[in-house]
Design a protein with these regions (language model features):
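Cleavable N-terminal export/targeting peptides
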Residues: 8-11
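Predominantly soluble domains enriched in secretory-pathway, periplasmic, or organellar proteins
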Residues: 3-5, 16-354
């Protein structure tokens, strides 16, 4: 996933929009359902943003910010009040290993910090272009993902040393661990799911999804029933629901426009996707063979990533408001429509729940 710079963040407007608007509110109404936006916190500050990470045990929310004053901002997960900042960390994503209490962010070099004190411990040289990041609790290893080779750099969370780099066979987007020694990675440019032996660090299979969609993005995992939820943006946005053990496709369902990151909540048996068009879609797993779209909730345009708070079952997402683009503004990344400058202090964190 590409980090969103402040000038080129995409606004995906409904085709039938009658009155032009450049603020962050989504233009489509919410469907009925149990979820709503519980709280909106105006965090403000300049700089782009990308991933968000929730540390449920420590009750902290991490949001890296870009721009001239790149930093890692830290918030109270319950109140959304600021609790600290790690300066000079302009990253796409962040993660914390719950065993060592070491945090990592996808700067280049990768920054490693003490999650208790927010003090930088060291930097770690890596190749490629660090983007996504996650901790595999199976063996306390941090996976740094890159669209450029090497596609994955695996770091020991305790020592901060690089264990190995991997070629995943294409550009990775979101990855998930089954907690038992297997990692699954949505390969964006190949329309497949890479299956990786997380102990021996070797790719063992690729599940081909090209018949269902291209432009892979989010990936979520139901550990109880061994089910993957793989999201694709083209030709129309869908989630492909897959048997994780053999790659067999169970079914597909529609999603909103511009899915980026997703999560599966085992407490509610729901796969949830954040969508750049200003919505959040909840897929209900009624049984291992029965799935349905439970709700599409209005959030904010640009709120395309999320984090799950496993203690409260709340979802956290974020977005900002933007002015109109200049007449000569160039398209954003991947041909996205141009966007104007960020409205000062409009950056907001949204808490979603029942």
């Amino acid at each position: 996933m590409q980090r969103i710079p402040p000038i080129f963040l995409t606004v995906v407007l409904a085709a039938a929009l009658a009155i032009p608007s450049f603020v962050g509110l989504a233009q489509n109404p919410s469907s009925s359902g149990p979820y709503k936006v519980l709280k909106t916190a105006k965090a403000g500050g300049e700089g782009g943003y990308d991933y968000v990470f929730a540390d449920g045990k420590a009750r902290r929310l991490y949001i890296p910010r870009g721009g001239q004053t790149g930093r890692l901002t830290v918030f109270n997960l319950d109140t959304l009040e600021s609790v600290g900042t790690i300066p000079n960390v302009s990253a796409g994503g962040a993660t914390v290993d719950p065993k060592s209490h070491h945090g990592f962010s996808t700067t280049k070099p990768v920054t490693m910090w003490d999650a208790k004190t927010l003090k930088v411990i060291k930097t770690i040289d890596v190749e490629g272009r660090p983007d996504g990041i996650l901790t595999d609790a199976y063996n306390s290893r941090v996976w740094v993902l890159s669209h450029q080779p090497p596609h994955a750099t695996i770091i020991d969370a305790r020592s901060g040393t690089v264990v190995k780099t991997l070629d995943l066979g294409g550009a990775p987007e979101q990855a998930v661990s089954n907690g038992r020694g297997t990692m699954y990675v949505n390969i964006a440019d190949k329309a497949n799911i890479a299956v990786v032996d997380a102990k021996n660090l070797a790719v063992t299979a690729h599940y081909d999804m090209s018949s269902k969609g291209t432009g892979g993005s989010g990936l979520a995992f139901d550990a109880k029933n061994h089910i993957l939820f793989a999201y694709y943006r083209q030709p129309s946005p869908v989630v492909v629901i897959i048997n994780a053990d053999n790659g067999n496709i169970i079914t597909t369902l529609p999603t909103g426009t511009g899915v980026d990151t997703v999560a599966f909540n085992p407490a509610t048996m729901e796969a949830i996707s954040a969508e750049n068009g200003g919505s959040m879609t909840f897929i209900k797993e009624n049984s291992p063979t029965d799935f349905s779209v439970e709700q599409t909730l209005q959030t904010m345009v640009g709120a395309k990533t999320l984090a799950l708070d496993t203690k409260t079952n709340h979802l956290l997402t974020m977005a900002a408001e933007y002015g109109p683009p200049a007449p000569d503004a160039k398209p954003g990344p991947a041909g996205r429509p141009p966007r104007g400058p960020m409205i000062a202090d409009s950056f907001s964190i949204l808490m979603v729940g029942k």
